[in-house]
Amino acid sequence: MIPWNAYVRLLRLNKPIGILLLWYPTAWALWMANQGFPSIDLLMIFLLGTVFMRSAGCVINDIADRHIDRHVARTQFRPLTAGEVSLSEAFILLFILLCASLLLLLKLPINCFYFAVISVLITFLYPFCKRFLNAPQLILGLAFSMGIPMAFIASGKNLNSDFIVLFLINFSWIIAYDTMYAMTDKADDLKIGVKSTAIYFASYDRLIIALLLIFLHSLWLVWAINKNAEWFFYLLWCTAAGILTYQLKLIYARIPKNCFKAFLVSGYYGLVMWFAVGLALI
């Protein structure tokens, strides 16, 4: 019998937050590069590409961490670690996902290919960075930002000032929310020697997260003013600021379950800012 449930959990399809956090910045870029009206074809290519590559990243991560995950309370029952999915099955799934992603890539301009290659290489590298790099979230930030230049190029746009601002916003956002995520496993990571910004930032973790959130949310203002955005953008911007404030409140006591909740709340921030960008460009 094919273990479909285990496959779903291996690909994290039962936990779509990772897909959403990869999709929202790509959607922001598509809307910016197309003045609020991206084509259906582009939307479908990038949406499916997001699902395929996020799932591929999860498989790569679980293959690399299969001997580590059993020592972490939150990950010890992942399908590969628990033996529900074999290593060969995981590699087959990974091959299928990468082939599906390649088929989508063939529909995009050749310059997108270069960023896609960088994305795949970084995706393979990231799990191992947690073993030797004090801030592996920097690598994750690059991996989760590759959809932005690809969206601009696929839309026939240069990597202009909008791209630079959006890349900085997303890169900072990823470091902030993934540090919240890493705070969840900090005790286990310290025991087994896995590195993260939650450990590297030490007692300054909350302060650095707050500064990153202030920085990236301020950049949205810079972009909006440059675009002469209407009042409804600023209304949604204030709503999103409230979400960030709530996240900071959640992580204040550094309680693992609350830190994980703060990470999950990032999805709402991405959604609100997607609406804000869309309305600003109408």
Curated annotation (Swiss-Prot):
Membrane topology type: Multi-pass membrane protein
EC number: 2.5.1.39
Any one of the GO CC terms: plasma membrane
Matches recorded under InterPro entries: HB_polyprenyltransferase-like, Prenyltransferase, UbiA_prenyltransferase, UbiA_prenylTrfase_CS, UbiA_sf
Compartments, record wording: Cell inner membrane
GO MF annotations, alphabetized: 4-hydroxybenzoate polyprenyltransferase activity
Pathway info: Cofactor biosynthesis; ubiquinone biosynthesis
GO biological process, one term: ubiquinone biosynthetic process
TM annotation in the entry: 17-37, 40-60, 90-110, 113-133, 135-155, 163-183, 207-227, 231-251, 262-282
Major localisation: membrane
Cofactor: Mg(2+)
CDD domains documented for this protein: PT_UbiA_COQ2 (cd13959)
KW Glycoprotein (keyword) present: no
Keywords, sorted A to Z: Cell inner membrane, Cell membrane, Magnesium, Membrane, Transferase, Transmembrane, Transmembrane helix, Ubiquinone biosynthesis
Catalytic activity: all-trans-octaprenyl diphosphate + 4-hydroxybenzoate = 4-hydroxy-3-(all-trans-octaprenyl)benzoate + diphosphate
Taxonomy, superkingdom: Bacteria
HAMAP family assigned: UbiA
UniProt similarity note: Belongs to the UbiA prenyltransferase family.
Protein name stated in the entry: 4-hydroxybenzoate octaprenyltransferase
Protein species of origin: Legionella pneumophila subsp. pneumophila (strain Philadelphia 1 / ATCC 33152 / DSM 7513)
